[in-house]
Amino acid sequence: MNIKLSVLDQSVGVVGRAQDQIIRQTVELAQSCESMGYHRFWVSEHHSHPGILGTAPEILMAAIAMKTTRIRIGSAGVMLPHYAALKVAEQFRVLDALAPGRIDIGLGRAPGSDRKTAQLLNPNQFASDQFPQQILELKAWLSGTPLPVGHPGHGVFAYPQSETCPQIWVLGSSDYGAQLAAHFGLPYAFAHFITDGQGVDQAMALYHNGFQSSDPLAKPKATLCVWALVAETRQEALRQFSSRARFKMDRNYGVISPLMTAQLAQASFKPEEMGALKQLEQKAIVGDAKEVGDQLRTLAERFDLDEIVVITWAHDPSVQQASYALLAEEMGLGQPAGGLKRALSSKTSEPIFSL
């Protein structure tokens, strides 16, 4: 089965590294992923979150566009209720002018923040029940289709216009997003990494069964965004996974902190936490390249996917890059000659710091 792989990077903060450096490393990672043969590179939007530093995907996408030539670049996503749909359309039309035919816009309705921060981002924010109307407007403005007579936006267009158009995706981790994507005939990305797979069967069924053909999407197009980590051995993969496990357990305690080293994370687990750690390990997609590749192929076959989006956290950027490189080789992404070797040996800044 031929599966395309894509990447979601959240610019995860890590202990001991400057936050501005983290943002620059996301751009470097996009360049590496392009050389490995990945299909898309998406970046996220979160606010007032010390563990996830990607706050302005549209700006980060522009930087990545200038440093890449082939890979598709996208937001995963733009939290649309914070913004006016027209302004978002203008931003992404500019991005499409910078990287014609390579721009994706993933849309979410979650705040990506706490309620206080969401209110400060947009004191006149749109209610979440206006999300469908915002999508309708955004579709029109991105495609250059006039809004109907009587609509407040009739006669208004988003510039610059061009022959290409950003591809809209609906993001979600519940039934709502699946049904919305199906109604509008848009591609759908299920956030498997948020739910650890819970709810995915029903969401995918709702999307496929309710899909209404649209221009330009005649049939359903869905993907899963999964958290995965690959190392030379399963033991090493689990060791590196301990950083994320510590993060998730701390979050359950109400503590949000930057990602710590695997060594510190392993030393931090208390005897009473070992059961919870074991459960996280069992749910996680971690291991050597074949183990992880087999799990991704199983998911692709189960949901009839031709593409999966992978998100990997690691304190050390070289560990993260090696994980993507090993997975690319296992899945036969067809990176240019020497691409894997370059990725594994590429120079990265020494370690220092999502959902």
At which residue positions do the language-model features occur?
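Short, well-ordered coil/turn segments that N-cap beta-strands
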Residues: 1-5, 38-40, 68-73, 98-104, ...
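Acidic (Asp/Glu)-rich catalytic clusters
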Residues: 61-69, 96-102, 180-183, 208, ...
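A conserved active-site cap/scaffold subdomain adjacent to cofactor or substrate pockets
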Residues: 176-197
